Structure formats: C-alpha cells, structure tokens
Amino acid sequence: MKVVGLLLAGGQSRRMGGGDKALRMLGGTTLLERVIERLRPQVDALLLNANGDPSRFARFALPVVPDSIPGFGGPLAGVLAGLDWAAAQGPDYPYIVSVATDAPFLPDDLVMRLTNGLMEAGADLACAASGGRVHPVFGLWPVRLREDLRRAMVDDEIRTVDPVDRAPSLDDGAFRRHASRPVFQRKPAQGF
C-alpha cells in the first residue's frame, strides 16, 4: 500500500502570534525540516498543505497545495486538499497520512502503527492516540472517502473531528472510536 505523507501547515498560527509555525526554528532547524526528516522514510511521497504564497516553501522542493475549500479553515480542509492531490495522481496512492508540522517529534513508526491499527480493526480511518487522548490530525485517510469528507464539510459544516466532544458518535454515528485501539471506523453504509 503506497501512502502520501501530508504535512499540514495551512493554519494561521494565532496562538503563536501568526506567521508560519512550520518555519519556526528549533535547535537551528525549522519544525518543517524536522517533521520531513521523521516522515519521509515512512511514506512514498510528501506533500505540503499551506495557504498563501507557496514560494516561501520552495527550498523544501515539495508540491504545495492550498486548502480545497477556500476560507474554510481547520485541518480538515488541509486533509481534503491532500486527498484531492492524491486522487489526481491516479490509483497509485490510495491513502494519505496527515501530520501537523508543529510536532517535530512524531514517531518513526507512525505510519506502520496507523496502518496496523486500521487493518486490525477493519476500519476505514485511523488516527493516533497518546496519554488517553486521540489526535485526529495524525491520521491515515483513504482517498476513496474524499467526496464523503467534502460533503460533510460543505453540507453539514463539519470543521473538526473532535473525538473528545463527539465520540463515540461523530456525525450521527458515521464514526465511532474502537474501544481498545486509537482508530475511528466508518461503516460503508453510513455517511461521513
């Protein structure tokens, strides 16, 4: 299974006073460089989601895609942009893994863990969890669900996947958290 690594850098960084969090320095290296270093060995291709002028990321030599739904905001807009990009590449990339660019210490085996959790649970979607908290920004997303996600965002105005406030039932039961694994499941007969 080929996976595209989606680096989410589309936010406005309000809590950090604005600017690009991904370009903030940590020990002489940008957060983005650190995340790329961790994720690149785990995926077959890398893609950066960022809004505004993409030339500010030129030195990273990555495709840069803006949010698919302009003005929507939030990480789901970036995930949808990644799903759209992967779909445009053809059937070679059936999954994307999304990661935040302000998390420079992501696990070296994140993609393997997400893939294993997804397969073991028979789920469509998987996301990371730690310390009893689910982190949906770090997720494994099948490209085939992109239109379901688009409809949920546009028609139902879903802006986040918030497992704390909305689990176990997200969007009328479309998602449910597997009891013993950090996995969200989507049943084929249900909407997004």
How should these model regions be labeled?
Residues 1-158, 166-179, 183:
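Nucleotide and nucleotide-moiety/phosphate-recognizing core
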Residues 189-192:
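Acidic, Mg2+-coordinating catalytic module of metal-dependent nucleases/exonucleases
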